[in-house]
Regions:
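Glycine-rich, acidic and aromatic/proline-enriched surface loops and short helix-turn segments
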Residues: 1-8, 72-79, 126-140, 170-174, ...
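Non-catalytic, structured segments within soluble enzyme domains
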Residues: 1-103, 137, 235-239, 243-244, ...
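Second-shell loop/turn segments in exported
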Residues: 9-19, 28-29, 33, 55-63, ...
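Short, well-structured active-site flanking segments
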Residues: 39-44, 144-147, 170-189, 228-232, ...
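Conserved catalytic neighborhood of penicillin-recognizing serine enzymes
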Residues: 57-65, 174-233, 249, 268, ...
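Short active-site loop at a secondary-structure junction
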Residues: 119-120, 144-164, 176-182, 251
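Soluble, non-transmembrane domains of envelope/secretory-pathway proteins that act on or interact
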Residues: 188, 297-302, 343-555, 559-561, ...
Length: 595
């Protein structure tokens, strides 16, 4: 059986394709019999043997309660020391896993998700104080699938990502007391208009950033994403410990970037640890799963001691924790609440109910829980007692079931955030940065900044300011009409049209963007064919075309094809473009034959 598999492991996989595996085994046995390697009796016995049951196969790492964690540790070790040293023996590895918590993680998940055909779950628990991974549940059955749902699966976190957006805003000096209008919004995302609504079409009016995160308001956090910018959010996410690739699209502010459960646990652990991300001295910016590595017959020990790095202001982290406590007290995470325990956290649900999250923490433990179908993005519309699965349902229930099984000290509490006063200021985006409104700016926002924070430069807005539209690429008439509608005055200048381009279009303008006072001039450059325009040669005789080409000083390249003899059938470039001296014009000329 084993000898037949390597030629095509997928085709001859005995668990996936047992019939093909049996036929392949028989082929190998035939060869062995012909070569005298086995007797007829041995052949018959081997041919009748049952295929092994995959559930009876003991894979390396499956003997304990944490097989997915063991595999994750192996990957880290191979990346650091190489496969030869890791699998060749001689290393003694001490890990961070807490077997009691690992067993409790499985028990908590099984107590909530009782249907084997229903959604699956992933869970990661981290001690925020030293970054140690204490539990990692990556799937129900390691023998059937070695794919680690906790570390390898990448799924959208939805609103569980909003604390990272708020942390980004705090990094830029923006206070959570800043109020934005909760309403349907349309945001210019550059190549498209991003339209955002709240999932239940309920809007709160003017609301603070802190209250909006408790209510999981998409509209407000889409606007906040526009203020701080997607690139800054990606930078913050990576600094907090998320290692998955994130693209800086505007939708990232609502959790569209795919991340792992381990990613989310690390990011929240950084917040819970007063803004300090804990790396390992040996494995650096990776989840800390190894305590130390000892070598056989060597005194050298690689101690992967905690290495804290301040990546978020301590006061900002404490303020963020204070806000996230309200999510559990009065917001979408109420099912995670435990009497007498201080808990902070955030729910997350994707638009199609394909992913549901709860990431929460106490002063001693951060736990991230994901619920969904592992093999497909299947909407969970009825899996919660006939209702959709949101982050505040099954994930929050698993989180609570796990935390109630732990031996945490309930008397420990979060540090109170320091007072961070500030003032609200009108600001406007100009030239890619936020500047102070000089009193004439349109589209400005009222933003509350921490003391000593916020923009210092004043915008150069004009009285009765209007926006300068981009008219490059329009016809002269279209550009003049667009500018007049603002109202702005068009000053027309001309520029030579490039050979092969259509003349009469706007090829430049000054200014290209920004604001001007109503009636101010905008200079536009319209392309002009200085050497004439290419005529329509199709249908003309080749002799006439050659004379015109000589006059225009263009170079003809002719080839023949079926059609009226001596007549031009097709030309490239098409007529109406600007002529350039020496420009190549390709013609198809009829040779008198029929198609």
């Amino acid at each position: 059986l084993l000898a037949g598999i390597p030629s095509d492991p997928s085709l001859y996989d005995p668990s996936a394709n047992p019939h093909a595996a049996i036929l392949r085994r028989r082929h190998v046995l035939d060869l062995m019999l012909k070569q005298g390697k086995i007797t007829q009796r041995q052949y018959a016995r081997a041919d009748k043997a049952e295929l092994p049951d995959p559930n009876d196969i003991r894979l390396p790492g499956t003997q304990g309660p944490a097989p997915y964690f063991v595999n994750y540790v192996k990957d880290d070790l191979v990346a650091r020391y190489g496969a030869g040293r890791v699998f060749g023996g001689g290393l003694k590895v001490t890990t961070t896993i807490d077997m009691k918590l690992q067993l409790k993680a499985r028990a908590a998940i099984e107590s909530v998700l009782r249907n084997p055909d229903g959604p699956a779950a992933a869970l990661v628990a981290i001690d925020p104080r030293d970054g140690a991974v204490k539990a990692m549940f990556g799937g129900r059955n390691f023998r059937r699938s070695q794919f680690n749902l906790a570390a390898q699966a990448r799924r959208q976190p939805g609103s569980a990502f909003k604390p990272i957006v708020l942390a980004t805003a705090m990094n830029e000096g923006i206070s959570p007391v800043t109020e934005l209008e909760s309403k349907p919004v349309s945001i210019d995302a550059g190549d498209r208009i991003w339209k955002v609504t709240n999932y239940d079409h309920t809007y709160l009016g003017r609301v603070s950033l802190s209250r909006a995160i408790v209510s999981s308001d998409n509209s407000v956090y889409a606007q906040l994403t526009d203020i701080v910018g997607p690139k800054a959010i990606v930078k913050t996410a990576h600094s907090l410990g998320i290692r998955s690739h994130l693209s800086p699209y505007f939708s990232i502010g609502l959790g569209s970037g795919a991340v792992s459960t381990l990613d989310m646990a690390r990011a929240y652990a950084t917040i819970a640890n007063d803004g300090r991300r804990v790396d390992g001295a040996v494995f650096e910016n990776r989840a800390r799963v190894v305590e130390k590595v000892e070598r056989f017959r060597s005194s050298k020990v690689d101690v992967n001691s905690p290495l804290p790095r301040q990546v978020l202001d301590e006061g900002h982290a404490e303020l963020l924790t204070d806000i996230l406590e309200d999510v559990v007290r009065v917001g979408t995470g109420k099912r995670a609440a435990i009497s007498g325990r201080q808990i902070a956290g955030k729910t997350g649900t994707t638009d199609n109910y394909g992913d549901a999250w709860f990431v929460g923490y106490t002063p001693e433990l951060v736990v991230a829980v994901w619920v969904g179908y592992p093999d497909a993005l299947k909407p969970m519309l009825t899996e919660f007692n006939g209702e959709p699965v949101a982050g505040g349902t099954l994930p929050a229930m698993i989180w609570k079931a796990f935390m109630e099984r732990t031996d945490e000290d309930p008397s420990r509490s979060f540090d109170s955030p320091p007072y961070q006063g500030g003032a609200s200021t009108w600001v406007v985006r100009r030239e890619g940065t936020w500047q102070l409104d000089n009193g004439y700016c349109r589209g400005s926002r009222l933003v509350a900044y921490f003391s000593g924070e916020g923009p210092e430069d004043e915008a150069d807005c004009k009285p009765n300011e209007v926006s300068v539209p981009l008219v490059v690429g329009m016809t002269r008439a279209g550009a003049e009409a667009t500018l007049e509608a603002q109202p702005l005055e068009a000053n027309v200048a001309y520029a030579p049209a490039k050979a092969g381009r259509i003349p009469g279009l706007v090829v430049g303008q000054d200014p290209r963007s920004g604001g001007l006072s109503a009636g101010d001039p905008v200079t536009i450059w319209v392309s002009k064919a200085e050497h004439g325009m290419l005529p329509n040669f199709v249908g003309s005789g080749i002799a006439d075309v050659q004379r015109e080409a000589t006059r225009l000083k263009v170079r003809l390249v002719a080839r023949t094809g079926p059609g009226r003899k001596g007549a031009v059938l097709r030309q490239d470039p098409k007529p109406g473009v600007a002529v350039g001296r020496g420009m190549r014009v390709t013609l198809l000329v009829g040779d008198g034959s029929r198609t």
